[in-house]
Amino acid sequence: MTERGLLIVLSGPSGVGKGTVREAVFKDPETSFDYSISMTTRLPREGEQDGVDYYFRSREVFEQAIKDGKMLEYAEYVGNYYGTPLEYVEEKLAAGIDIFLEIEVQGAMQVRKAMPEGIFIFLTPPDLSELKNRIIGRGTESMEVVEERMETAKKEIEMMASYDYAVVNDVVSKAVQKIKGIVETEHLKTERVIHRYKKMLEGLQ
């Protein structure tokens, strides 16, 4: 029987650097995760590509996927839908492949209910002023939207206790090392490896 893969869920407030950390994790030669690309109805930012950063879809297409039960999770955030297609995630986990989700906090809580065995990591900013500077630095939102995102971020940070781990994103390379350590630790938990030793003992009988 193939050992089921780990589901690693990374989320945190808007502007905390989830995408940057996720990219750094996947560039690290010591990691071997598969990445589940999220679907969204928001417009692409400069440099983003459909099917690489997100699946950019219309609101109608997204809502049909919800009705058809094809979304593992979804949330509406600042007027746009974000979500994770279910089929790809299930296929990879069943094949024993670790899969990495980078999603919004609302969506992470839905995944927590659907797949409580997942590993949930909350990425935090060093402080709120730094978070605000990062959002402003994107240059893609009006100050009204920035303030809206900050209010949402405060509420999301209060939900940190619902996660298994918290990682501060002050230096990206340090955040990546911490995430790698978390995944390595999870793979060593006895409930994941004990079946191997049971088979070994059976072979000695």
From Swiss-Prot:
Compartment list: Cytoplasm
Source domain of life is Bacteria
What GO cellular-component annotations does this UniProt entry give? cytosol
Q: Which GO terms describe its molecular function?
A: ATP binding; guanylate kinase activity
Domain Guanylate kinase-like: from-to ranges? 5-184
Task: Summarize the protein's role.
Answer: Essential for recycling GMP and indirectly, cGMP.
Which SUPFAM superfamilies does the record match to this protein?
P-loop containing nucleoside triphosphate hydrolases (SSF52540)
Q: Indicate yes or no for the key word Repressor.
A: no
- Quote the record's binding site residues for ATP: G12, P13, S14, G15, V16, G17, K18, G19
Which HAMAP family does this one have?
Guanylate_kinase (MF_00328)
Q: Which Pfam families match?
A: Guanylate_kin
Q: Which NCBIfam families match?
A: guanyl_kin
Secretion signal: which residues?
Answer: none
What does the record give as the reaction this protein catalyses?
Answer: GMP + ATP = GDP + ADP
Protein name per UniProt: Guanylate kinase
Write the record's keywords in alphabetical order, separated by commas: ATP-binding, Cytoplasm, Kinase, Nucleotide-binding, Transferase
Q: Which residues cross the membrane?
A: none
| Keyword match Cytoplasm | yes
What EC number is given for this enzyme?
A: 2.7.4.8
- Please name the top-level EC class of this enzyme: transferase
Chief location: cytoplasm
Q: Which family does it belong to?
A: Belongs to the guanylate kinase family.
